[in-house]
A protein has these predicted regions:
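Acidic, low-complexity intrinsically disordered regions
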Residues: 1-137
């Protein structure tokens, strides 16, 4: 992909809605070949840059509550996992494809944005430019 030519190293992991205890590298194998999120946190050093890409649109319970996940029972709230990522890595960004003018219509977007403390940008040329500046701070 074009992204692989722009980054020295690029590892891609998937999750559904909110980050929980497992991620996967291929969506078709999401139930059979999962990677513990703790392993990802231990594998990559704090100097790595982390970019989330997603609409952040979900039930607020998925972020705030244990057991709020829609596909499995999560023992810890998604916010706990987001906090772990934000504490481990200094340079974290969330790129959101939902037009920024619509973010206020979805409470979960606001919750994720609060966790990311201003490090959520829209998937626009201007947003990507701002996101890259944020990652380099």
């Amino acid at each position: 992909s074009a992204a692989r030519s722009e980054f020295k190293s690029l590892d891609v992991f998937y999750f559904h809605n909110c980050l929980y205890e497992f991620v996967w590298t291929e969506n078709k194998r999401r139930w059979s070949e999962r990677t513990p999120t703790h392993d990802v946190l231990r594998t990559f050093g704090p100097d790595h840059k982390v970019i989330f890409v997603g609409d952040a649109s979900m039930s607020p319970y998925e972020i705030l509550m244990p057991g709020g996940g829609v596909e499995h029972f999560n023992d810890e709230a998604g916010s706990v996992w987001l906090k772990r990522v934000l504490e481990r890595f200094a340079h974290v960004l969330w790129i959101n494809p939902v037009p920024e003018g619509r973010w206020g219509w979805t409470p979960s977007i606001d919750l994720i944005s609060q966790h990311f403390e201003g490090r959520m940008v829209p998937l626009t040329l201007e947003g990507l430019d701002e996101g890259m500046r944020l990652l380099l701070k």
